């Protein structure tokens, strides 16, 4: 760079602004140079164009026409991210409104520009040095709201200095201060000038402009006066070294990665500061997400629980089973009751058992109700008369005691295997084996306790008494027919063939017509499909509730983020003024949106697990919360935050610095 090259140079710069249907010429062909080490005051009445000139010099705005050069390089044509890099490294800003972030301490406010610098480190030491320069070491733990106006402006100056910028831009730095604080601020600026700092200041007060060594006066968008004061001498201190290449800086800014320089961590911290600063609003905005995630967790817990219950129930029923039950005959359209036509016999059981190529075994059953009494205790229960093969087919062989023998069934012996519920109600913790009980006033000897089965979809499977089928038919219930026949098929592949063969046999034995509905044959696959269908329907219902809740919650998040963008427009302007790129602003608001939805998601996960536990305890429903459901809930929370936060984040990123800073 030649020694005569100015630090800043404007060549025939024009700037117009639309006002309603007309336009205002804020700058009309302004040309000027500012050299290293100058202290320049720009003066003029309201509407003269002085602020517009400062905004262009500080890269907060672009001219419509003309050139703006820094160190001889034309910069007004640079892309937005390139200008952001220059604002961060070349310029420091002091505003009339201070523009400090209320939620941050003054140390964090001062080191804020370094989030966007691409440099690693927390820069606390540099922030302390800047605060020491402006005399605020005794206020380190304070927030802006705890400081006076003069102290807040000193914090703003410290923030402007932390990156050791080439130029300090001050827009009415004393405009909101009393005379004493104004004097203190101007002494600080004067001292910085003596150290070699280039300062460009806008003011409308002559006594403030008197601190500058050069005064430019604006009127109607034109420079009408440019005076250097005779009293001014060269700065006493060394000048700030001009080593920054704007074009190299633009390339560096464009290549910055939020993952490499630690900015992402800063965005996360600031996002949660914003969330916790508005706790009630944040909580209300995530209610939809909370309900949606809780629904997902509860839905999947119920679905998994139902699946486990179905598997356990089918396991308790035995494998590769088909059941043959009596249907309902109809006379003139009126149902005649279960099994009114097809009343099965032991011959049916024997004939089915002889199908050796398809069937491993068959057992007939008869069902009724029974009153069982032991001592002074009695219990109403289900009474099942069953065959010998039933124990192994339906997994009822006792773990305590024994099962019936074929001889006991043939002789119609009065022996019983009782379920766990019956044993508990009649005997408590005592062993019932060998004791005599009365079933419908007939004495029976307890020979075994059936394995625990748990609840099925309609009843407690442990609330049952099993007796030999012949005993039940001829001694207790007084029947000469079977209610149902259970058939164990040799393989799952042979179930369809076995069903067809059994159907043909029943039709033949009972002389029924083809397609007669007086009996039906079912296998466990049909039962499983029926139960699974019910579970799927419930899951779809809960899934719909979850989807609607997530949609409503997402819209709530988008609404609250749009409000947040509006409320924080000046903050966005400040961040852009100190070097934030479009990507930085967009990512910050996206992180905040995702932070909200993840917070709602975490609360929803806890609520969903709690609801599942309550359903298990009070409703007796089977539930099973899985890691998969928690991962899915977290994933959908994050996706909702990204999807519904994208528009507000984009809106924030597209704000122009100068317009955002002026927002009322």
UniProtKB/Swiss-Prot annotation:
Quaternary data: Homodimer.
UniProt keyword tRNA processing present: no
GO CC aspect terms: plasma membrane
Binding sites annotated in the UniProt record for ATP: 44-51
Transmembrane segments: 283-303, 543-563, 602-622, 627-647
Record localization: Cell inner membrane
Documented EC number(s): 7.6.2.-
Pfam families attached to this UniProt entry: ABC_tran (PF00005), FtsX (PF02687), MacB_PCD (PF12704)
One term of GO molecular function: ATP hydrolysis activity
Natural source organism: Chlorobium luteolum (strain DSM 273 / BCRC 81028 / 2530)
ABC transporter domain residues: 8-245
Topology of this chain in the membrane: Multi-pass membrane protein
Main location: membrane
Function, in words: Non-canonical ABC transporter that contains transmembrane domains (TMD), which form a pore in the inner membrane, and an ATP-binding domain (NBD), which is responsible for energy generation. Confers resistance against macrolides.
GO biological process: response to antibiotic
Enzyme class name: translocase
Gene this chain is encoded by: macB
Protein's name in the database: Macrolide export ATP-binding/permease protein MacB
Lineage top rank: taxon: Bacteria
UniProt KW keywords: Antibiotic resistance, ATP-binding, Cell inner membrane, Cell membrane, Membrane, Nucleotide-binding, Translocase, Transmembrane, Transmembrane helix, Transport
Protein family per UniProt: Belongs to the ABC transporter superfamily. Macrolide exporter (TC 3.A.1.122) family.
InterPro entries, per database record: AAA+_ATPase, ABC3_permease_C, ABC_transporter-like_ATP-bd, ABC_transporter-like_CS, MacB-like_ATP-bd, MacB_PCD, Macrolide_Exporter_MacB, P-loop_NTPase
This protein's record includes keyword Protein transport: no
């Amino acid at each position: 760079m030649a020694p005569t090259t100015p630090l800043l140079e404007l060549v025939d710069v024009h700037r117009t602004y639309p006002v309603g249907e007309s336009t205002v010429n804020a700058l009309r062909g302004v040309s000027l140079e500012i050299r290293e080490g100058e202290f320049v005051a720009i003066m003029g009445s309201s509407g003269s164009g002085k602020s517009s000139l400062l905004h262009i010099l500080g890269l907060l705005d672009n001219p419509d026409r003309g050139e703006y050069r820094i160190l001889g390089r034309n910069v007004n044509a640079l892309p937005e991210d390139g200008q952001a890099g220059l604002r961060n490294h070349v310029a420091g800003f002091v505003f009339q409104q201070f523009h400090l972030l209320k939620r941050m301490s003054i140390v964090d406010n001062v080191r804020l520009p370094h989030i966007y610098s691409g440099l690693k480190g927390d820069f606390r030491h540099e922030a302390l040095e800047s605060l020491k320069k402006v005399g605020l070491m005794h206020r380190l733990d304070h927030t802006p709201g705890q400081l006076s106006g003069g102290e807040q402006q000193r914090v703003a100056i410290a923030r402007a200095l932390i990156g050791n910028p080439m130029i300090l831009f001050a827009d009415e730095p004393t405009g909101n201060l009393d005379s004493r604080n104004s004097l203190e601020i101007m002494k600080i600026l004067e001292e910085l000038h003596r150290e070699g700092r280039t300062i460009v200041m806008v003011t409308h007060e002559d006594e403030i402009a008197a601190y500058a060594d050069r005064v430019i006066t604006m009127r109607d968008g034109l420079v009408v006066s440019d005076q250097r004061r005779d009293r001014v001498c060269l700065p006493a201190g060394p000048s700030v070294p001009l080593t920054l290449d704007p074009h190299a800086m633009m390339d560096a800014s464009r290549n910055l990665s939020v993952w490499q320089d630690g900015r992402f961590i800063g965005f996360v911290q600031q996002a949660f500061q914003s969330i916790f600063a508005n706790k009630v609003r944040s909580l209300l905005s995530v209610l939809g997400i909370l309900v949606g995630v809780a629904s997902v967790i509860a839905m999947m817990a119920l679905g998994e629980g139902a699946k486990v219950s179905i598997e356990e129930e089918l396991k308790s029923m035995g494998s590769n089973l088909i059941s043959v039950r009596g249907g309902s005959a109809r006379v003139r359209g009126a149902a005649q009751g279960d099994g009114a036509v097809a009343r099965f016999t032991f011959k049916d059981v024997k004939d089915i058992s002889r199908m050796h190529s398809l069937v491993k075994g068959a057992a007939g059953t008869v069902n009724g109700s029974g009153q069982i009494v032991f001592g002074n205790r009695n219990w109403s229960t289900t009474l099942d008369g069953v065959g010998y093969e039933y124990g192994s087919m339906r997994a009822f062989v006792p773990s305590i005691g024994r099962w019936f023998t074929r001889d006991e069934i043939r002789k119609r012996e009065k022996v019983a295997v009782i379920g766990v519920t019956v044993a508990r109600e009649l005997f408590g913790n005592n062993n019932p084996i060998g004791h005599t009980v009365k079933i419908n006033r007939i004495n029976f000897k307890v020979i075994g306790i059936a394995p625990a089965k748990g609840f099925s979809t309609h009843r407690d499977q442990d609330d049952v008494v099993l007796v030999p089928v012949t005993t039940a038919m001829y001694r207790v219930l007084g029947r000469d027919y079977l209610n149902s026949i259970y058939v164990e098929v040799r393989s799952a592949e042979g179930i369809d063939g076995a069903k067809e063969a059994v159907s043909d046999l029943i039709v033949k034995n009972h002389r029924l017509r083809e397609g007669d509905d007086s009996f039906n044959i079912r296998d466990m696959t049909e039962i499983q499909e029926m139960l699974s269908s019910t579970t799927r329907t419930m899951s779809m219902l809960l899934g719909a509730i979850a989807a609607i809740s997530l949609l409503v919650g997402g819209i709530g998040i988008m609404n609250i983020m749009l409000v947040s963008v509006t409320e924080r427009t000046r903050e966005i302007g400040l961040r852009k003024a100190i070097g934030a790129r479009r990507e930085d602003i967009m990512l910050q608001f996206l992180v905040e949106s995702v932070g909200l939805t993840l917070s709602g998601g975490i609360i929803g996960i806890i609520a969903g697990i709690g609801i599942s536990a309550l359903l298990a305890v009070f409703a007796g429903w089977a539930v099973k919360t899985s890691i998969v459901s928690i991962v899915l809930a977290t994933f959908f929370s994050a996706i909702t935050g990204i999807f519904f936060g994208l528009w507000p984040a984009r809106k924030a990123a597209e704000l122009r610095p100068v317009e955002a800073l002026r927002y009322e």
